[in-house]
Each structure stands twice: as C-alpha cells, then as structure tokens.
Amino acid sequence: MSVTSDTATGTGFTAAYAWTAEVDEAPVSVSAAGDLVAVAGAGGTVRVLHAAAGAPVDVFPLSEGLLHAALSPDAQHLVVAGPGGHALWRRADRRVRRALTGERSQAAAWSGTDRVAVAAGRRAVVLRPDGTHVWTTGPGAGAVTGVAWMRGGRWLAVAAYGEVRRHERHPAAPVATYPHTGSRLALALAPTGRWICSGNRDVPLRVWRTRDGDRLALSDAPEKVSRLVFDDTGRWLAADGTPHVTVWDFSGDGPAGSRPRTLLAPAAVTALAWRPGTRAHLASGGDDGTLCLWRAAAGRAGGSLRPAHRYALGAPVVALAWSGPGLLVAATREGRIAALRLPDGTRL
C-alpha cells in the first residue's frame, strides 16, 4: 500500500487531501472512529490506518473474505464480518480472535465500547470486545442482514427476510416484530429510539413507530432502498432507491403526509454518510466516481437540491466514512482510499 497527499478541486472551493492510498483489492467497507480508519477488502485483507496521515497500523486477513467492518467508538477494537464468520481485533496488542463458524456474517454494530452485535446466520450474537459471549437472539426466518442498537443498548433490532425483530436480552425471542415483504437491503434506527426504518428489494421504504408498532404511510417513498441512514440528531433520514437521494424530516410526529427533499445526484448513488454534528451535511458517492457534499436540510419539503460541492475520484465510490466533522474518507472500487480534509469543521 502506498500513501501520498495532493489536492482535490471541487465546485466551490479547493480542499486538501489529508492523504490518499492505493490498495491491491477492491474495498467493501470503511469504518472510522477516534484516530483510526479501517478498510475491509473483498479478498479478505483488513487494513487499519491512522486517520490523520494514512500510515498503516496493522494488516491482517480473514480467509473467507469480508463484507463489513466496524470500529468501536473508542477505536480500541474492530469487528470484521464475512461469508464464513467474523473476527475481533484488539489495538493494544494487535491480537485477532477469529470465529470462522461457516455462518454468513454481513453486519455488526457496537453498543458503546463494551458490547458488539454480530450477524451469525439466522441469529445475532452479542459479544464482549474480547470475544466473550453475552447472549444470542433466537433464529429468524432467514439470514440476518442488519443489526442496530436502540435505547442506549437496551434494545437490539435485527433485520432478515420478511421482518425486522426487536430484542431485549431476555428472552431470546423478540419482544416486537415488524413484518415486511421480501429481502431487506437496509436498516436504520433513529438515535431517539422512536423509529425503525427498512429498505427492501420488493417494496418501498418502510417506517414503523416503536411505541405502538404502527407503520407510517409515506408519500413518494422510494423503492429498492439499499442505503438508509439517520443523522446524529435523528431528525433527518437519507435514502437511495431512486435515481436520486430522498431526505425525510422526522421531527414532530414524523414524515407521514409530508414530502421529502430530493437531492439531484449526478449518477446512481453507491454510498451515503452524514457529517457528524447537527447541521444536516451529507456526503454521497456515485458509480461515476463523483463524491458530492450536500446541505441536505436546505430549501423546503418537496423541493430539489443540487450538490454544494463535487469531486471526481476517478472510479465508482463503494464506501464513505467520516473521521470527525473535518475528515471524510472515501474508497473506490479500484482500490483508492482518499481522505478529504474540509477547510472548515462546521460550514459547507
């Protein structure tokens, strides 16, 4: 892997790349936390880098390949998941604990720094950072495709074919089930714990209110949503699934009866990531290699927005991750990792 630095010229201003790197396999997932960035490659190589300069910290393999990576919030641990199982990495001594069970694992989510939920076939397993087992959900109807924590780690949402299940530690059976049709492609939970949202292959965007399990009727809901993410405040939800991106306002009683803002992306969207903070700044990547930055809450409901800034990365963007509000890390299908440093930490 080689690391260099240069500048990126976009519409509106010129921003410096903190660093760029080239890797020899296609990235599939990028995670950033604290002073680290983790890059998971399709061939099974995990690279842990310093966020500030891109210098390597560690490299290790997962023999069955990779689908997902997630750093703990304190950047002291990393979980990676793939077709044959998962692995946990510890920063203090670079120790890797592999659990190659043969069960497909394509999702993981941390609850604080002391617990991580990992998809394991038709179940989700909750572990300590050292790999110690805490509890396991009961099996669902199909393979688990998404996991997310709610209510400060008291609830765990697990998505699979035909349903999203909400679990508490005891019993292993779900305390609530939110049914849908077909395969789930994306799962997002509001930080407030009020909403569960699901993107699906066969039906439009689904939204449930956790208090009573009611499903909201949405106007202009996109179909085939595969990327779905709330901002830090829980007010704004971004979804792909159309030629563009829709942004939904979850303030008050939620988005039922309202229309979303439409972000006019220049090409099919392949990655979405909210900038940390409360200003509703969104980054999107496209299959034409374009990286866009958006003021996603500008204008009015039902209106259309164009990018505030655009950058050309030269190959389809496969993953985005923010390392704080001032550094955006993007990965392309051809193996380029680019860390873009924005000139101001709060404005866009």
What is the role of each PLM region?
Residues 40-43, 81-83, 119-121, 159-161, ...:
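Conserved strand-to-loop turn within each blade of WD40 beta-propeller repeats
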Residues 318-348:
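Blade-level signature of beta-propeller repeat domains, shared across WD40, Kelch, NHL, RCC1
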Residues 32-34, 73-74, 111-112, 151-152, ...:
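Residue-level detector of Asp-centered blade-edge/turn motifs that repeat once per structural unit
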Residues 46-49, 87-90, 125-128, 165-168, ...:
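WD40-repeat beta-propellers
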Residues 37, 78, 116-117, 156, ...:
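Hydrophobic beta-strand positions that form the internal "hydrophobic ladder"
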Residues 20-27, 60-66, 100-105, 138-144, ...:
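WD40/WD-repeat beta-propeller blade N-cap
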Residues 2-24:
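A short helix->beta-strand "capping" segment at the edge of beta-propeller domains
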